[in-house]
């Protein structure tokens, strides 16, 4: 091997190694060893006053990673003529940003300018799951914060009306597999959905059916009572499953029973491969948790274009 080829090989090995090592659970071991603990405390405190916080943080993290990668861009406020992601239509109902603000404030007091807002959100999402009775995991850290946040880009988020082909494409564009899709959909075990997210299944479903025939009839009737065709009740909707504050596999059990809310949930039963995974997770909470952790680490490692550590998560430096 000549010297030129050897040097090229060294460069390639270095670049690949750098990418692999870019995120690490030990990233703050020496610069801010208490980072995880500080974020956990902020989430715990918020949860003691508001049981909707875990679902909010988990959803916030998903929405961050699916637009520009996991760079904390969903946390930025709109400014001037720029309408930020958090004010895009799919994100209007996002809340609990104050939890990230509180964690950031505490971290800045202990480790000024060290921990990124993107990492704080990733840690908070992990804590949201763990503190709701779900699994915990070592979060790879080292993300940088992005400087761009545009509401129009929230169109890239998977919609609750997506079919399985649209979901496959949407997740695939982010390097996520169908296994990841089914596992991450289990995050719907936490939280609440507004009527607008599933009205399409209850009223004028298609030219032949008024209501989606895959819905359990009694379940559909209950939803119609909450979400009539001309609903005027602000924030009307339904819990995502029967144990809204517990992270478990009830979501999959309800899905099999025809009691899911979103068309995108029901679409997981449309093809044999994903239907098999739904059944697997419905039958074993342990299998679900194992798959969820693996897919969460994968999703939260989607690289963004961030290059700074914000001092305030709502605005760039």
Curated annotation (Swiss-Prot):
Residues 1-22 form the signal peptide. Pfam families: peroxidase. One of its GO terms (biological process) is response to oxidative stress. Induction: Pathogen and elicitor-induced. Up-regulated transiently by a cold treatment. Ca(2+) 1 binds at residues 64, 67, 69, 71, 73. Binds 1 heme b (iron(II)-protoporphyrin IX) group per subunit. This is Peroxidase 64. It comes from Arabidopsis thaliana. The gene is PER64.
């Amino acid at each position: 091997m000549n010297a030129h080829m050897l040097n090229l090989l060294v460069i390639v090995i270095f670049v690949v190694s750098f990418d692999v090592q870019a995120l690490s659970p030990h990233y703050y071991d020496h610069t801010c060893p208490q980072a995880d603990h500080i974020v956990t405390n902020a989430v715990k405190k918020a949860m003691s006053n508001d049981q909707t916080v875990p679902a909010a943080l988990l959803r916030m993290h998903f929405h961050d990673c699916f637009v520009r990668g996991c760079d904390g861009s969903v946390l930025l406020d709109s400014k001037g003529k720029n309408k930020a992601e958090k004010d895009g239509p799919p994100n209007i109902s996002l809340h609990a940003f104050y939890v990230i603000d509180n964690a950031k404030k505490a971290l800045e007091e202990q480790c000024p300018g060290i921990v990124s807002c993107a990492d704080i959100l990733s840690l908070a999402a992990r804590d949201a799951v763990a503190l709701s009775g779900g699994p915990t995991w070592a979060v790879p850290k080292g993300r940088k914060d992005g400087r761009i946040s545009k509401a129009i880009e929230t169109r890239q988020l998977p919609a609750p009306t997506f079919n399985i082909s649209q979901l496959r494409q949407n997740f695939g564009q982010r390097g996520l597999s169908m296994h990841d899709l089914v596992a991450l959909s289990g995050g719907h075990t936490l939280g609440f959905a507004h009527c607008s997210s599933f009205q399409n299944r209850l009223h004028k479903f298609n030219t032949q059916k008024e209501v989606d025939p895959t819905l359990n009839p009694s379940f559909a009737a209950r939803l119609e009572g909450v979400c009539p065709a001309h609903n005027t009740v602000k924030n009307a909707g339904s819990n995502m499953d029967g144990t809204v504050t517990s992270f478990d596999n009830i979501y999959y059990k309800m899905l099999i029973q025809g009691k899911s809310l979103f068309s995108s949930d029901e679409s997981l039963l449309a093809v044999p491969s994903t239907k098999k995974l739904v059944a697997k997770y419905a039958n074993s909470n342990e299998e679900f948790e194992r798959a969820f952790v693996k897919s969460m680490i994968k999703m939260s490692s989607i690289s963004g274009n961030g290059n700074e550590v914000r001092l305030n998560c709502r605005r760039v430096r």
